[in-house]
């Protein structure tokens, strides 16, 4: 019996969960691990929500699952997402000789908020640097899930890093 910090009742089923459960994909060594959880039975299928059209997809093993989602631009492996974000942070920050503060809680949260991380370097008007850095930092980290950037004197800059979910293919993000 798992208890979520915040959960909701979905549909007419007697189950509280963080998100709606539609299926349980459970395969190991190319075999379905059969079990029931409330109103659901495990199988080798799941529902894919693509362009607001729900489709049932079957998988023979984890490799086929991971391959399918990779083609969709989704990194299933949390460690791969984490390493990609770290690598991009380092690349951007080392070019500018700047840094971010260690905030593993925020970093772990962001790793789990995205499927296909896209790191963006953003900035705000320098006039807002008159606001105490503690307030700027708290606001960016707690409310916006951004990573404020600091110079080598430990002063906050008007730049910050964000981790977006997927690349902006249509050019809608203006930085």
Where are these regions (language model features)?
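Long, basic N-terminal domains or extensions that often function
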Residues: 1-145, 150-154, 166-167
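Elongated, amphipathic alpha-helical interaction scaffolds
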Residues: 156-158
